[in-house]
Swiss-Prot record:
GO terms for cellular component: chromosome; mitochondrion; nucleolus. May be involved in the ribosome maturation process. Complements an ObgE(CgtA) function in E.coli ribosome maturation. Plays a role of GTPase in vitro. When missing, disorganization of the nucleolar architecture is observed. InterPro entries: G_OBG, GTP-bd, GTP-bd_Obg/CgtA, GTP1_OBG_dom, GTP1_OBG_dom_sf, OBG_GTPase, P-loop_NTPase. Belongs to the TRAFAC class OBG-HflX-like GTPase superfamily. OBG GTPase family. Keywords: Chromosome, GTP-binding, Nucleotide-binding, Nucleus, Ribosome biogenesis. It is found in: Nucleus, Nucleolus; Chromosome. Residues 149-344 form the OBG-type G domain. GTP binds at residues 155-162, 202-206, 278-281. This is GTP-binding protein 10. It comes from Homo sapiens (Human). Residues 13-148 form the Obg domain. The keyword Nucleotide-binding applies.
């Protein structure tokens, strides 16, 4: 019988993926009642995505976290129409979700130069406002970063995710022979000979209870949401966080990881998934791998070994299972090819689904137009033709 265990964990590093900001649009300019002049509109506040920006840089650059746009120019004899106040642009990284104080989503920034209006400037003084300017909009906004990647690495600490990322890409994450080496998400890119690029996100190792925010689980589980596919990375020799916690076999780690994803957000289980069985250079690795494969072929035959609350509603069906060694390089090329093949298949399926949807919409549109009753003009014309 597999039992649950709990343990205290040290705090993660100073990686920032959430910020709360105060924003205010600029006030409008004064109107000129005697000549009917209109004051300029206050500047607006925008959130703009930039590729090489981080929330930590934003916080360091603007420690007060207050962003106020410029005031509109007053109307005057030499310029009856006042000019608009200067807009304020807040630089943020790509992958930001912007919400208001009530949690309502204002918008998302998924590529460079995407921009969202978060606070409008006030109107300038004009006849409708008795030539008095209006104040700009005040708004508290929350920036929530979710990394965007093709593949997200999922695994317990010390499974070799960082070593794997350094093998398949040019990323240089911190690597050491102890748990929790990775303290913040890392992004790398797999480069192929035909210049195809696939982005991979290495997340800090999950732990049992991550769905309840143990080990800051929510802080890093959310980054999996925007990955197209998941790559489970498990240690063939199993995992034990410390001498005070229970040892887990490779099969048990897969089941427990699946359960953590399910409890955090069920939709994550619907993502296409691959499995990399790491550390195949260790003694007895081949025997353990054959045992793991037999367990994965019929997982339901072994679920009775787990406590009921640890069994996921559905087990993950891996598209590819690849034995690898991030130390010797064994299986790395095969893994890279499987990742690309899986993503290409997913893209083809999405394109086919989109094409079918477009054809269905076209057919519905044609059907509706053919069943519409003829217009009065059409009926009158036909009678005249008969006469």
């Amino acid at each position: 019988m597999v039992h649950c265990s709990c343990v205290l964990f040290r705090k993660y590093g100073n990686f920032i993926d959430k910020l709360r900001l105060f924003t205010r649009g600029g006030s409008g300019g004064m109107g000129y009642p005697r000549l009917g002049g209109e004051g300029g509109k206050g500047g607006d506040v925008w959130v703009v995505a930039q590729n090489r920006m981080t929330l930590k840089q934003l916080k360091d650059r603007y420690p007060r976290k207050r962003f106020v746009a410029g005031v509109g120019a007053n109307s005057k004899i030499s310029a009856l129409k006042g000019s608009k106040g200067k807009d304020c642009e807040i630089p943020v990284p790509v992958g930001i979700s912007v919400t208001d104080e009530n949690g309502k989503i204002i918008g998302e920034l998924n590529k460079e130069n995407d921009r969202i209006l978060v606070a409008q400037g006030g109107l300038g003084g004009k006849l409708l406002t008795n030539f008095l300017p209006l104040k700009g909009q005040k708004r508290i906004i929350h920036l929530d970063l979710k990394l965007i990647a093709d593949v997200g690495l999922v695994g317990f600490p010390n499974a070799g995710k960082s070593s794997l990322l350094s093998c398949v890409s040019h990323a240089k994450p911190a690597i050491a022979d102890y748990a929790f080496t990775t303290l913040k998400p890392e992004l790398g890119k797999i480069m192929y000979s035909d210049f195809k690029q696939i982005s991979v996100a290495d997340l800090p190792g999950l732990i049992e209870g991550a769905h309840m925010n143990k080990g800051m689980g929510h802080k890093f589980l959310k980054h999996i949401e925007r990955t197209r596919q998941l790559l489970f990375v498990v240690d063939i020799s199993g995992f034990q966080l410390s001498s005070h916690t229970q040892y887990r076999t490779a099969f048990e780690t897969i089941i427990l990881l699946t359960k953590e994803l399910e409890l955090y957000k069920e939709e994550l289980q619907t993502k296409p998934a691959l499995l990399a069985v790491n550390k195949m250079d260790l003694p007895d690795a081949q025997d353990k791998f054959h045992e793991l494969m037999s367990q994965l072929q019929n997982p339901k035959d072994f679920l009775h070994l787990f406590e009921k609350n640890m069994i996921p509603e559905r087990t993950v069906e891996f598209q590819h299972i690849i034995p690898i060694s991030a130390v010797t390089g064994e299986g790395i090329e095969e893994l890279k090819n499987c990742i690309r093949k899986s993503l290409d298949e997913q893209a083809n399926q999405e394109n086919d689904a989109l094409h079918k949807k477009q054809l269905l919409n076209l057919w519905i549109s044609d059907t509706m137009s053919s069943t519409e009753p003829p217009s009065k003009h059409a009926v009158t014309t036909s009678k005249m033709d008969i006469i």
